[in-house]
Amino acid sequence: MIKIALCAAILAIAYAEEGTVYLFDPTGKSGVSGNVRFLQLPNGINVVGEIRGLPPGKHGFHIHQEGNISPSCLAAGGHFNPKKKLHGGPDDSVDHRHIGDLGNIEADENGIAFFNFIDSIISFKGETNIIGRSVVVHEKEDDLGKGGHPDSLQTGNAGGRLACGVIGVKTIC
């Protein structure tokens, strides 16, 4: 009984402290895969990851509305946008971006993207809670809503979806 109570207490703490996601292509076509951790810090969420199998260059990286990634990441829906704002970049204010707009990650010549940044808008609670939502890596660079393309203010004109996964809670029990 003590072990159950201890695990419940740890789960409550972990829920507020760390999320994790394994990214992959559910269709198996792109070969893209990787891991991303979301760590609560005093000034926001630290997003740390490694993704392999990408074409070299920049790729849009977003949190999407739904936690459903079947059959080909399309069920993830649009960018996480509870405030109903236009698309923007991670440096834009909450009034000028979707909550899920995390900008771009960049793959090197070997197709590997390492990244480590802090986002002050996403969270593990309330209206901006990312737990149970999906992360999507896109085929093209996100123009951060400034590209002038008809899709710029909705998707950043980042193209198709190469890999996705659902953000879960990391626990030690």
Give the residues covered by each predicted segment.
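N-terminal leader/targeting pre-sequences
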Residues: 2-173
